[in-house]
UniProtKB/Swiss-Prot annotation:
Class of this enzyme: hydrolase
Superkingdom as given in the UniProt entry: Archaea
Xref: Gene3D superfamilies: 3.30.1330.30, eRF1 domain 2, Pelota, domain A
Protein name: Protein pelota homolog
Species of origin: Methanococcus aeolicus (strain ATCC BAA-1280 / DSM 17508 / OCM 812 / Nankai-3)
Subunit: Monomer.
EC number: 3.1.-.-
Record key words, sorted: Cytoplasm, Endonuclease, Hydrolase, Metal-binding, Nuclease
Task performed by this protein: May function in recognizing stalled ribosomes, interact with stem-loop structures in stalled mRNA molecules, and effect endonucleolytic cleavage of the mRNA. May play a role in the release non-functional ribosomes and degradation of damaged mRNAs. Has endoribonuclease activity.
Length: 348
């Protein structure tokens, strides 16, 4: 995310999202009734020909809408903000409905009552863009799954199946192993920076040996770790363990995973945790909240209630973390009511 311009007296910040993560951050910053302005395509009627209602010309115009619907669409790589037009060219009717498609590398101006956590989120997104992509390969002797870890969740970018069979002779087995490793490399190679390869058993060690013999330049970029599981279970194990943070520095999704798992652990032993709005409010009365966890969905639907809670937590020196429901731990927190708190000390 690039913060291009700030106009504090008008509560306007102009930004340029650079990737999908930035669009997701903006989907949590832009709220209903916020003013969103950008260059956009708008179909205007051809006044010279009234015979055909479907005629008109699409042209690029700069206009603003009062946000009514905000939809993050990972598949089309855009954030759609719909609402009545509040300003634009003279020939565009004020109050008519329009959808602005916010896409990477296109400027957008947002006018709203900026909260402290909104500004922090912009700053986090700005810093995140400077970090390399986090690539994790979970593999064993039958298949390998390659994931890219984003701020808002995980995307599978490759799944490779081994064609190794015990029915093959040793020479054919060696060749199938090489084919398997090369297919994994083909998915890994385009990404810069460190790559984490993890999994149970010895296959990852054999892959490491293959890299040391044939691809020493790639070996320097790869870190190998052990897990008990493959696939998404193996990935969850990696995120929970903190390995990703040790390799890449603090990663948002890894931090979220560890915090929600800590919350679940404390709940299971009736320890330093509460969940649900009423219990969180009660813990705040004792100034006991150390870390407040809220899902992005719950925040969007209950902004006014949660603003007071977040401010109260910050007033006692605590912190608030917004958890993405695009990934498993966010869904777990959602099942608890969308809100929970880690405590400084136990309360009755």
């Amino acid at each position: 995310m690039k913060i291009i311009k700030e106009i504090p007296e008008k509560n306007i910040i102009k930004v340029m999202p650079e990737n999908l993560d930035d669009l997701w951050h903006l989907s949590n910053i832009i709220l209903k009734n916020n003013a969103v302005s950008a260059m956009t395509e708008r179909r205007t009627e051809d006044k010279g020909d009234k015979l055909r209602a479907d005629r008109g010309t699409k042209r690029r115009v700069y206009l603003g809408v009062k946000a009514e619907k905000i939809k993050f669409d990972e598949n089309t790589n855009r954030l759609r903000v719909s609402g009545p037009i509040i300003h634009g060219p003279e020939d565009v009717p004020i109050g008519s409905y329009h959808t602005i498609d916010i896409e990477p590398l296109k400027d957008v101006s947002i006018q709203k009552n900026w909260k402290k956590w909104d500004l922090q989120r912009l700053k986090d997104a700005e810093n995140s863009a400077k970090k390399p992509k986090i690539i994790v390969v979970i593999m064993d002797d039958s298949d390998a799954t390659v994931f890219i870890i984003r701020d808002y969740g995980v995307k599978e970018i490759g799944h490779i199946k081994s064609r190794l069979s015990k029915k093959l002779d040793y020479k054919r087995q060696d060749q199938e192993n090489i084919n398997y490793y090369n297919e994994i490399l083909e998915v890994m190679s385009p990404y810069e920076g460190k790559i984490l390869v993890a999994g149970p058993g010895f296959t990852k060690n054999n892959f490491q040996k293959y890299l040391s013999e044939k691809h020493k330049d790639m070996l320097q970029r790869v870190v190998f770790e052990s897990t008990n599981h493959t696939g998404r279970l193996g990935l969850a194990e990696v995120l929970k363990s903190g390995i990703v943070d040790r390799i890449y520095g603090e990663a948002r999704l890894s931090k979220e995973t560890q915090l929600v798992n800590k919350l679940l652990e404390e709940i299971s032993k009736k320890g330093l945790a509460v969940y649900g709005v009423d219990d969180v409010k009660n813990a705040l009365n004792y100034s006991a909240i150390e870390t407040l966890l809220i899902t992005d969905e719950f925040l969007r639907k209950n902004r006014r209630i949660l603003e007071d809670l977040i401010n109260s937590v910050e007033a006692i020196g605590g912190s608030s973390i917004i958890i993405s429901t695009e990934y498993d731990v966010g869904k777990q927190l959602k099942a608890l009511g969308g809100i929970g708190g880690l405590l400084r000390f136990p309360i009755e």
